[in-house]
Amino acid sequence: MPTSTSPPVDSSLVHGEVVFDETGRSFSGATVYVRLEDVSRADAPARIVAEQILQDIAHTAGTATQLQFALEGAVPDERARYAVRVHVDVDGDGQVSRGDFLSMESYPVLTYGNPNNVTVRVQELR
């Protein structure tokens, strides 16, 4: 029986951009956490493989704000599933809370034919 895996991947380099929802409110001084996560285990928390932290980020409501990112971790397991997740910590408390911006969709990368370049849209948590 054939297995459902992708060809081997040489590196877990993932790059792309974070795009803010234009309807979200203005802010400044935020910290953005961009994480590459192993999301293979259905009933367990995702494991962080790589993280980039962007500090002192600002966004003006009604404008298109884009941030570039690059994440690199160990060579990925071709049988695992990976995704990029973004949390924009507006209030600086280190927790996901109302007023922060989050990626609300899954952004799979690296294995199973998924890309290594993604555009991650974030929306304000209301």
Give the label of every model feature segment.
Residues 2-7, 107-126:
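Extracellular beta-sheet/turn segments enriched in Thr/Pro/Gly and aliphatic residues
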Residues 20-22, 38, 90:
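Short solvent-exposed capping/turn motifs at the termini of beta-strands
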Residues 31-37, 83-87:
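Beta-strand signatures of extracellular beta-sandwich domains
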Residues 50-74:
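A beta-strand/beta-hairpin structural motif
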Residues 76, 87-102:
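Short acidic/polar inter-strand loop motif in beta-rich domains
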